[in-house]
A protein has these predicted regions:
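C-terminal polymerase-core module
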Residues: 378, 382-385, 389, 396-450, ...
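Acidic beta-strand-to-loop metal/phosphate-binding motif
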Residues: 93-99, 238-249, 525-527
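A generic structural motif
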Residues: 743-749
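Conserved RNase H-like, two-metal-ion catalytic cores of nucleic-acid enzymes
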Residues: 14, 20-21, 25-32, 36-37, ...
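Conserved "right-hand" nucleotidyltransferase catalytic core of DNA-directed polymerases
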Residues: 155-218, 252, 261, 278, ...
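Conserved catalytic core of nucleic-acid polymerases
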Residues: 352-359, 476, 480-481, 485-488, ...
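A polyanion-binding, active-site-adjacent surface
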Residues: 1-160
Length: 815
């Protein structure tokens, strides 16, 4: 079964026929076929330009053709032989395997994600693998990727055989050769390789066809000479260096060799991700999209795995340099245009302060760590005991016990013992977190199950212990993370473990862990956090009078929203929140409410809330906080119910009241939709542009709506980090930045300079509160909260006016 022009010189090989192929008498029918037609049209390939054949025309299950490692069975080998014979008769110029099976048949390699987009010469024709349009092709980025690969195939559709680009790579040069190569080089790409905990080599490329790789694995006197030559070049501010994820190289050069990069830096990964945030951003991917260099990244691991020699590893480094140079030549004009240049240069400006954060780290109190572990173990034991009592009560069986870590036991309990209809995932019963959230909620047929909530809490604490409390620290007992400047599409940082496997994601440090992250001796920690940043920004973006009114009156937005949604007096909301705190036990919450007297109103809480709906498992203010965090971003009632643990009917009522009180939000959403449709992207109020790919449906609109405030919030904190790092003020020089976490920055300040602390905090506050202008022309700022203390987990709230006095009191109390 085939499709298209049999005489075409471009042949597409699909893995299997479309599901409706025999019904419709077409190999590319149905939804997948329609998708392929769209991709071909986007690539400029007409029906007459291509011929489609099938690698597996009888639709044999893939498992009967090849195993998971790509080894063909006898049936698979026969199919591969048939395909090759058919292609030899067709005499194509280019063949495009569109899937894992067809890729394996032609290239004897099943690793499609590594090979796609590369060109290979095979038996008289060229082979360019791509992804399967019948499966992954329904994902918008994948459609663009397949289209790009087909465009490449169209360009290569000539009789001439494919020849990989010639590369002149000088490896292990003498010092005088290195000096001559770099002497007249003002603009180079650069890449390092680390092996055995040391920088093994540094590669440079000053054009698209050549590279020079400096081998640093040599006797110390020679190594010192090579380091001096490389350092002089990289530390020269008149030079320009292009890298791929070059913050990694900068961090390693400083951490391992105290080599500072002062040259002007460009980064292909950052450039690509700013322009196309939905695509992958590895050098492998960028090479396949922007160059004609075939896949080579395996070569980097050959020597480390005992394959090949050191020369092959050096040669691999040179290929990285040439690939990076070529990618930059394709990207630079667009990313340095007015459309993207501001956010690109701002992102690159973060490199130096982030390298400092990665190098400095945060002091760890190992004794406190052991105490935190012990407290968590005791908490798990206590919660587990509570769970056993609850399941005995719920099941009316005094001998009932359950292992919260056993999905089988949990399913038997909920769906067997209690006889509840099972929640399913992929058609099978499940007790995952979403299912437990549903079980914890009340329905018209039953009360919410506290046992489900306890199991959630136990699993969360168990994960906390295994994921966060058993992490590795560096030898100097400091907590470090590896920061990623474009870790998210909004411009927010992300982070993870260091190259050595120590540390963890600094963005998700739980409160329990912060207790043992402490100030250095004779220092005090300061955390400055944006106050309800995204909510405030959204208020001005939407120009909603209700939200702006809450901000200008200075009322806590979470309490104000709770009052609007429930009708409960503000004083009662504040009193109840103070009494309940973060308690989630519905019985305990009910008891607290029944006994609570709101002193400012001289009335029982129950009387003041008569007729109002109350969330079972959280305080009224916490419910308002959940509304503020979710409903601005178009969350529906069902998802809101899962997020809050409230009943769906309650969530529908809360959502309706929220959107009635803040009535400009739905209008703003539609304005955002119109903007995305007209420009295929958005520019936020800090002049940062983001492109959006695909159909402008509700899913994309939710992403776009969330992007606008989140990107502005990230921009404020990141720009403050840059400004404060480079500040010439003596007070700022004394203050050290230790972490950048979402909407906050953590500092430490020497206690022997507390007289200057208030001034430092004032400068930092000014940096963190730039004046913004809404689309309606209204100027506004997002306020900053401040906390200080000796442990990140035990900070004291203060004000910028009182921070000096508070610091002195803390210091005196500690003495």
């Amino acid at each position: 079964m085939t499709w298209g022009n049999e005489k075409a010189k471009l042949i597409l090989v699909i893995d299997r026929p479309a599901s409706r192929a025999y019904t419709d008498s077409s190999i590319i029918s149905g939804r997948g076929g329609h998708n392929l037609h769209l991709i071909l049209a986007h690539a400029g390939i007409s029906n007459n330009d291509a011929y489609v054949v099938c690698a597996n025309p009888t639709d044999i299950p893939e498992g009967a053709i090849m195993n998971t490692k790509g080894v063909l069975t006898e049936r698979g080998a026969n199919l591969a032989r048939d395909l090759k014979s058919a292609l030899e008769l067709l005499k194509p110029h280019v063949v495009v395997p569109m899937g894992r099976v067809s890729c394996t048949f032609l290239l004897q390699d099943h690793r499609l994600d590594k090979l796609r987009g590369s060109c290979f010469q095979y038996n008289g024709f060229k082979v360019i693998p791509t992804r399967n349009p019948f499966t992954s092709g329904f994902n918008t980025p994948d459609r663009y990727i397949i289209s790009a690969d087909l465009s490449k195939a169209k360009r290569h559709c000539t009789p001439e055989p494919y020849k990989p680009p010639d590369m002149n790579i000088i490896i292990d040069p003498a010092p005088n050769v290195v000096e001559r190569y770099l002497a007249d080089a003002d603009h180079v790409s650069c890449d390092i390789e680390v092996a055995g905990g040391q920088v093994f080599c540094i590669g440079f490329s000053k054009d698209e066809d050549s590279a020079m790789v400096v081998n640093l694995d040599r006797p110390i006197p020679e190594r010192a000479v090579m380091w001096r030559i490389c350092a002089e070049f990289l530390d020269d501010p008149t030079k320009t260096v292009v890298g791929q994820n070059f913050i990694y190289d900068m961090n390693m050069l400083w951490r391992l060799n105290y080599l500072r990069v002062s040259a002007k830096v460009h980064d292909t990964m950052i450039a690509h991700h700013i322009m196309y945030p939905e695509f992958e951003k590895s050098l492998q991917f960028l090479t396949s999209m922007y160059t004609t260099i075939p896949y080579y990244k395996d070569e980097g691991g050959f020597w480390k795995r005992g394959i090949g020699d050191r020369k092959s590893f050096l040669y691999y480094n040179g290929k990285d340099c040439i690939a990076t140079y070529r990618v930059w030549e394709k990207l630079k004009d667009k990313v340095l245009s007015d459309k993207f240049i501001s956010q690109y240069t701002e992102t690159i400006s973060m490199y130096e302060p982030l390298v400092y954060l990665m190098y400095r780290g945060i002091n760890v109190d190992m004794k406190e760590l052991e105490l935190v572990k012990q407290r968590l173990k005791e908490e798990i034991t206590s919660l587990d005991a509570s769970l056993q009592g609850v399941v005995q009560k719920e099941s009316d069986h005094e001998c009932m016990e359950i292992n919260y870590n056993s999905p089988k036991q949990c399913m038997t309990y909920f769906y067997g013992t209690l006889g509840l209809p099972p929640y399913r995932k992929a058609g099978k019963p499940t007790v995952d977190d979403k299912a437990l959230a549903q079980l914890a909620k009340s329905t018209s047929a039953r009360e919410g199950l506290y046992s489900a909530q306890l199991i959630q809490q136990l699993r969360q604490r168990n994960k906390l212990f295994s994921t966060y409390l058993d992490i590795e620290f560096d030898k100097d007992q400091r907590f470090r993370s590896e920061y990623r400047p474009r870790g998210t599409r909004t411009g927010r940082l992300s982070s993870g473990k260091t190259f050595w496997g120590s540390g963890m994601n600094a963005q998700n440090v739980p409160p329990e862990m912060k207790a043992f992250l402490v100030a250095d001796p004779d220092c005090l920690l300061i955390e400055m956090d944006k106050r309800q940043s995204e909510w405030v920004i959204t208020a001005y973006l939407a120009n909603d009078p209700g939200m702006i009114g809450v901000i200008t009156t200075g009322v806590d937005p979470h309490s104000a929203t709770a009052e609007m949604v429930t009708g409960i007096p503000l004083d009662a909301i504040l009193a109840e929140n103070k009494a309940i705190g973060h308690t989630t036990n519905p019985e305990e919450i009910e008891r607290i409410r029944s006994e609570l007297i709101v002193e400012s109103l001289s009335a029982p809480f129950k009387l003041l809330t008569e007729g109002s709906f109350l969330p079972r498992t959280l305080s009224v203010r916490q419910m308002g906080k959940k509304c503020n965090h979710a409903l601005n971003y178009m969350m529906g009632a069902r998802q809101f119910s899962l997020e809050t643990g409230m009943g769906e009917a309650e969530c529908i009522e809360a959502r309706n009241k929220y959107l009635s009180g803040y009535s400009r939000l739905p209008e703003w959403w539609e304005e955002v939709r119109a903007d995305v449709k007209s420009d295929r992207g958005l520019r936020n109020i800090t002049n940062q542009y983001r492109a959006f790919l695909g159909l402008v449906d509700d899913a994309m609109l939710k992403d776009a709506v969330a992007h606008l405030p989140q990107s502005v919030s990230a921009w404020m904190v990141n720009m403050a980090m840059i400004d404060l790092y480079h500040s010439p003020h003596a007070e700022c020089v004394a203050g050290e930045m230790l972490a950048n976490v979402h909407d906050s920055i953590l500092f430490q300040y020497p206690t022997d300079r507390l007289d200057e602390l208030a001034r430092f905090c004032s400068i930092a506050k000014h940096a963190m509160e730039p004046e913004l202008t809404s689309p309606a022309g209204i100027p506004f700022r997002v306020e900053t909260d401040i906390k200080i203390g000796f442990s990140w987990g035990h900070m004291v709230e203060t004000t910028f006016q009182e921070v000096g006095d508070t610091a002195w009191k803390l210091l005196e109390a500690r003495r």
